[in-house]
Amino acid sequence: MRFLVAECEPPQAREKRRESVGRSSGETYLEVLHKLAPGAECDRIKPTDSCAEIPGREALTEYDAVFLTGSPLHLWQDSPEARRQIDFMHRVFASGTPSFGSCAGLQVACVAAGGKVRPMGDRREAGFARRLVATERGRAHPLLDGRPASYDAPAIHTDEVEALPEGATLLASNRVTRVQAAEIRCGEGVFWGVQYHPEISLREVAAALRRQSDDLLEHGLARSNADVEQLAQQVDALHAEPNRADLAWQLGLDDQVTVPEYRTRELRNFIEHLVKPTRAKRGR
């Protein structure tokens, strides 16, 4: 199989993430995809960069899947970076290549297909999205195959989908963010996406908490930087020892987050239930 990872991070955010966790969002995706699909050929591009060469429709048809990463990019702002990312997604839809996105990746697909994204205001999901529940349509959708009736997932975002495009299917919600998972069809393309982050490790969750410490204080989710650091240290410790029941209990987490095979379930489902059947239809 041949995969293309499209990094939604602008250059400054990409380097800031590398400083805190050692890799960009696209590099995280590459590592996870190599584990989920050993032997797959994976390329990475950076559509937000002004100097980036964006593949056209025909070039995109040579891939079996396209993955869009998370990012602090605000899709509700008219910026050159946002326009480049949305233009890239238009090409993905036109190519008919199956696509998947997490966090900003979902928001990019939504806007490109005619939906809307907005800032969350004072609400936040920082660290983990709690009590995610599939909709009636979501319970039968292969993206969420194997997920329990209610589950948690890594999540870090300050924007959300305000309105899905026409014809999209809402698959999961919680009390903080209505659109947590969705299927979007546009032109020849099919996109499956989630607002949370099935691709990131607990170590990356801890790093994200540290990067967003000031924002957490501003919105009353922590009283001090020391509070944020204490939480990040617990998450780091659980990453190092995922079988520690005491840390999982203190953080209110179960195996849906602590076990990598469960945490990455949506990515695995996308490859098994959409990418491989589409590849077979194309005679590859």
PLM region spans:
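A structural signal for short, well-ordered beta-strand segments and their strand-loop junctions
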Residues: 5, 42-44, 100-102, 172, ...
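Short glycine-/acidic-enriched loop or helix-start segments at secondary-structure transitions
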Residues: 15-16, 54, 77-78, 110-112, ...
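Pocket-forming structural segment of enzyme catalytic cores
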Residues: 8, 115-208
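A glycine-centered loop/beta-turn motif at secondary-structure junctions
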Residues: 176-218, 222-224, 228-236, 240, ...
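Cysteine-nucleophile active-site neighborhood
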Residues: 71-138
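N-terminal beta1-alpha1 cap of cysteine-dependent amidohydrolase-like domains
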Residues: 1-86, 91-95, 219-284
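Active-site phosphate/pyrophosphate- and oxyanion-stabilizing loops and adjacent acidic/basic residues
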Residues: 27, 31, 107, 158-159
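Short, glycine/charged-enriched secondary-structure capping and boundary segments
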Residues: 18-21, 80-83, 113-117, 168-169, ...
